Design a protein with these regions (language model features):
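N-terminal flexible/basic segments that precede or flank functional cores
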Residues: 1-42
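DNA major-groove recognition helix of helix-turn-helix/homeodomain DNA-binding modules
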Residues: 75-93
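Conserved interaction-surface patches within small, structured recognition/assembly domains
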Residues: 41-43, 66-70
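Amphipathic alpha-helical interface surfaces
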Residues: 20, 36-40, 49, 60, ...
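Short alpha-helical DNA-recognition segment
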Residues: 46-66
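Structural motif corresponding to alpha-helix initiation and N-cap regions
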Residues: 7, 73-76
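Short, charged recognition helix plus adjacent turn
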Residues: 3-4, 43-46, 91-95
Length: 95
């Protein structure tokens, strides 16, 4: 029986848009923005990589890394562009 590391499994799952969306929705339920930014960074890495997403969003790779770090403070415009570059979009729902 072969084993797979959790991060490798997660990376493969995040390539699926529906899974990635649910993953980000779950991360957004935490009141800590760091949780969401960490999750979004994993989605970016799985769904194109930092260099590709940076190019699609007209951000430098360094800026994208900084924006998605635990100390990042991205604007709505930047978040929307990053999500779009990964094939996702913002959504809002009632509690």
């Amino acid at each position: 029986m072969s084993t797979i590391k959790h991060n490798d499994w997660l990376f493969e799952q995040l390539k699926d848009a529906e899974f990635a969306a649910e993953y980000l929705n779950a991360a957004s339920e935490d009141d800590d923005p760091k949780t969401y930014l960490t999750a979004l960074r994993k989605v970016v890495e799985a769904r194109g990589g930092m260099a590709t997403v940076a190019q699609k969003t007209d951000l430098s790779r360094e800026t994208l890394y900084s924006t998605l770090s635990s100390r990042g403070n991205p604007t709505i415009r930047t978040l929307s562009a990053v999500l779009k570059a990964t094939g996702l979009k913002f959504g809002v729902s009632a509690h």
